Amino acid sequence: MSTLKMMLLILLLLLPMATFDSDGQAIPGGGIPSAVNSRVRGDEKSGRSLEKRCRSGKTCPRVGPDECCERSDCFCKMVPARPYWRNKCICL
């Protein structure tokens, strides 16, 4: 009986109740964009690139917003970051 109770508890915890409105209608996906994403999207719409926003003009592409390097003589290197690897600016 305890195994059955545990399975029911797990199923209830996994049920995506947060995706429903109070009247039972599903809330559309996408959510509210973060301030960073809004800023990046706004710059993309205006034709302003990340290189123009960075003082150094050097960026390292990564998941999410790209990282601006401090200087133009920096290079990108893959570094471990949980749960995956990401590019990081390395300046000598």
From Swiss-Prot:
Keyword Signal: yes
Subcellular locations according to the entry: Secreted
Sorted UniProt keywords: Cleavage on pair of basic residues, Disulfide bond, Secreted, Signal, Toxin
GO molecular function terms noted in the UniProt entry: toxin activity
Organism classification: Eukaryota, Metazoa, Spiralia, Lophotrochozoa, Mollusca
Signal sequence, renumbered to the chain: 1-20
PTM summary: Contains 4 disulfide bonds.
TM segment ranges: none
Protein name: Conotoxin Mr15.3
Family: Belongs to the conotoxin N superfamily.
Organism of derivation: Conus marmoreus
Secreted in keyword set: yes
